[in-house]
């Protein structure tokens, strides 16, 4: 389950050939089908009913610094597009409060759809929308990014999101 979770069932750029081989071997030993097990695991892990905004944001949240900017990034992985869609409007006001409470310049929150390998990135803080527009060449901050951007193919905070944000913030 750790390999499946870390690699998003081999979809993440963090996945290595050794990860895949180990998972296949372990699944054979355990007598399970990887796809079925992964779906059950992701469904259980993305069950957000009854969780507060704080629990959702801080479930997988890390702080970073780049240039003179301190920022935080949270992430939720789900198979359920409807569940992710509902989070968008719910989380933005809380993210602004969390940004102030944490003393951060910006907060980004990745709503990652495992099936479509797409992230809807929410952002708050002065200049955050421009950073996303510049880092991922999406939208035009002059027409207002509206605090969200769709990032096809982006599923990894570590390998995809943080490097792009860091390069942009350090310019």
Regions inferred by a protein language model and the residue ranges of each:
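Internal alpha/beta core interface subdomains
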Residues: 1-2
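Active-site histidine-anchored catalytic micro-motif
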Residues: 9-11
């Amino acid at each position: 389950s750790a390999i499946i979770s870390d690699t998003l069932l081999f979809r993440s750029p963090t996945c290595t050939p050794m990860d895949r081989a180990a998972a296949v071997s372990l699944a054979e030993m355990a007598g399970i089908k990887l796809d079925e097990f992964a779906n059950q695991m992701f469904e259980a892990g993305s069950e957000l009913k009854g969780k507060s905004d704080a629990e959702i944001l801080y479930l997988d949240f890390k702080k970073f610094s780049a240039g003179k900017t301190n920022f935080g990034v949270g992430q939720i992985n789900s198979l359920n597009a409807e569940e992710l869609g509902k989070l968008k409007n719910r989380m933005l006001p809380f993210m602004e409060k969390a940004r102030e409470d944490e003393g951060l310049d910006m907060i980004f929150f990745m709503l990652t759809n495992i099936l479509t390998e797409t992230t809807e990135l929410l952002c708050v803080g002065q200049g955050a929308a421009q950073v996303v527009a510049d880092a991922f060449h999406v939208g035009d901050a002059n027409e207002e990014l509206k605090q969200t951007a769709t990032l096809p193919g982006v599923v990894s905070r570590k390998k995809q999101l943080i490097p792009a944000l860091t390069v942009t913030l350090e310019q």
